[in-house]
A protein has these predicted regions:
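PP2C/PPM-type serine/threonine phosphatase catalytic domain
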Residues: 1-337
Length: 337
């Protein structure tokens, strides 16, 4: 399938998406988007299950999420609305599986982005991802619910080792498996020109993350970026012998800055703390130096006063002695006369 524009009447975003079958017999990925009362909504889901199960599951997920957000109570927080939407999709998949035995066991990953003037809110389950980029710099990324990424969390393996692992497709969380579903949600401030990419593992599992982000952060027009990325990933799969996974991506670019202010990351906090310590040391040093200078000045004044006093006493002594000498001379002269 060729790229499509994610049409919206909202002034603060623009977006494009593309989905390809890859080297498989069926594309089990699904994606959807809509202008909603809460903002611009995009969702990308990767289905799993034998026969028609995978495609059915991802399609149900997309429909239920979009419908749920459109019908939501606007007095609730966006985070709660997205959690409820994903859980509604989860129950709908389970219900369909119960009604049609051939679909039992089907499931789907899920990524959701709801962006408005206030912030971008992200929800996800499974190993499909959402990236936030500023140029080629990664500002935010979801963390896969998978066996290998649990090992990454424990610092047993690196993310690149996880990507290349034969167990990379074993996920620990998905829609359609159990009724009690944990949904991970994050709220992200954004700057003008930031890009949010939602993608399945057929995209992020094909190349190392640095190479992927370089392609997504390219300064070309967004439509060209999406097309180039899809073609490159498909080409890598074919060059590796084919049989590669379905690949789906949706990229949204912001046209303004969010009202939600960006929180300082750990590195920035450390830098600010370091500057504060340096300022404190500098101020303390200056105060100490001023006290030393003041003490030296006072000591110098005291010495000067003592010196003047001593000099004054010597002069007085000489003067008195001179007077005594004169009197003595007068007395002597008197006696002589």
């Amino acid at each position: 399938m060729d790229w499509i524009q994610l049409k919206t009447n909202l002034p603060y975003v623009t977006g494009y998406a593309e989905s390809r079958i890859g080297g498989r017999s069926e594309n089990q990925d699904s994606y959807g988007y809509a202008d909603t009362p809460l903002g611009f909504l995009v969702t990308v889901c990767d289905g799993m299950g034998g026969g028609p199960g995978g495609k059915t599951a991802s399609s149900i997920a997309v429909k239920e999420i979009v419908d749920s957000v459109n019908e939501a109570n606007r007095e609730e927080t966006v985070s709660n609305i997205l959690i409820k939407a994903v859980r509604r999709a989860n129950l709908a998949i389970i219900q369909r599986g119960a009604e049609q035995p051939e679909l039992q066991g089907m499931g789907s990953t899920c990524t959701v982005l709801l962006i408005n003037e206030n912030a971008a809110t992200v929800a996800h389950v499974g190993d499909s991802r959402v990236y936030q980029l500023r140029g080629t710099q990664k500002i935010f990324r979801t963390f896969d619910h998978s066996m290998v990424f649990d090992l990454v969390k424990q610092k047993v393996i690196t993310e690149e080792q996880a990507r290349l692992s034969a167990q990379s497709n074993v996920i620990t969380r998905a829609l359609g498996i159990k009724t009690d579903l944990e949904v991970e949600v994050a709220e992200c401030p954004y700057e003008k020109g930031d890009r949010f990419m939602l993608c399945t593992d057929g995209v992020h599992g094909t190349m190392d993350e640095k190479s992927l982000l370089k392609l997504v952060g390219d300064k070309n027009e967004l439509q060209k970026v999406v097309t180039t990325l899809a073609m490159r990933i498909d080409s890598v799969g074919r060059n590796a012998g084919g049989g590669h996974d379905n690949l789906t991506l949706a990229v949204v670019e912001t046209k303004c800055k969010s009202k939600l202010k960006e929180k300082m990351n750990k590195r920035m906090k450390l830098l600010v703390c370091s500057l504060c310590v340096l300022c404190f040391v500098s101020i303390a040093g200056n105060i100490f130096q001023c006290l030393i200078n003041k003490e030296n000045s006072e000591h110098s004044i005291k010495l000067d006063k003592i010196s003047k006093l001593v000099y004054s006493q010597d002069t007085t002594t000489v003067s008195v002695a001179s007077k005594l000498d004169s009197i003595r001379k007068i007395i002597i002269k008197g006696k002589e006369q």
